[in-house]
Design a protein with these regions (language model features):
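Charged, amphipathic alpha-helical coiled-coil/dimerization segments
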Residues: 78-132
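C-terminal regulatory/oligomerization modules of transcriptional regulators
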Residues: 1-5, 53, 128-147
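N-terminal helix-turn-helix DNA-binding core of bacterial DNA-binding proteins
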Residues: 27-72
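N-terminal leader segment of winged-helix/HTH proteins
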Residues: 1-39
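Residues at secondary-structure transition points
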Residues: 8, 15, 39, 68-71, ...
Length: 147
C-alpha cells in the first residue's frame, strides 16, 4: 500500500501546483501590465513576432486559448494595430512594425527575466528532472481521466 506524507508536515502536491500557478500568473500579469499588455495581447504579439502570419493562421496557432465567447484574436490584433505595433500587408499578413518590435523586445526581456527568477537555484539537472516528473504526472492523470 502506498504511504503518503503527513499533510500536517508537508502540504499536499495539489496545493503546490495551484500555488505555483497562482504566483506565475500574478508575476506575468504584473510584468505585462508594465508594458500595457495582458496575457492574450502578449500571446498575439509574441506569435506575430515570429514572422508574418495571416489572421486565420494566428487563430489556429493560438486555438487552445480561444472559446465560444472569444472565437478569434482579431480584436487583439486591432488593439495592437491601433498602437502602431502591428501592420497588415496587402495580402493581409500581420507583421510587427518598428515600434512593435521595440515594444516586444522590452516586454520579452522583462518576461524572460521573470521566468529566470522562477527557476533560480535549480540546476539544469534539477530543472530537467522537474519537467520530467511533471510530464509523467500529467500523463498519469491523462490515463486516469481516459479510463
Amino acid at each position: 500500500m502506498q504511504q503518503y506524507p503527513d499533510v500536517r508536515q508537508h502540504r499536499p502536491f495539489g496545493y503546490w501546483v495551484k500555488e505555483i500557478d497562482r504566483r506565475i500568473e500574478e508575476m506575468g500579469r504584473r510584468v505585462l501590465a508594465e508594458h500595457g499588455l495582458d496575457r492574450r495581447l502578449w500571446q498575439v504579439l509574441n506569435t506575430i513576432a515570429s514572422g508574418p502570419i495571416g489572421p486565420d493562421d494566428l487563430d489556429r496557432a493560438l486555438a487552445p486559448f480561444l472559446s465560444a465567447d472569444e472565437p478569434t484574436l482579431r480584436p487583439y490584433v486591432d488593439d495592437l494595430a491601433r498602437r502602431g505595433w502591428v501592420s497588415r500587408s496587402g495580402e493581409g499578413d500581420l507583421t510587427l512594425t518598428d515600434a512593435g518590435r521595440d515594444a516586444y523586445a522590452r516586454a520579452r526581456e522583462r518576461m524572460y527575466a521573470a521566468r529566470a527568477r522562477v527557476v533560480e537555484g535549480l540546476s539544469p539537472e534539477d530543472y530537467d528532472t522537474l519537467m520530467d516528473l511533471l510530464e509523467r504526472i500529467a500523463g498519469n492523470l491523462g490515463a486516469e481521466v481516459a479510463a
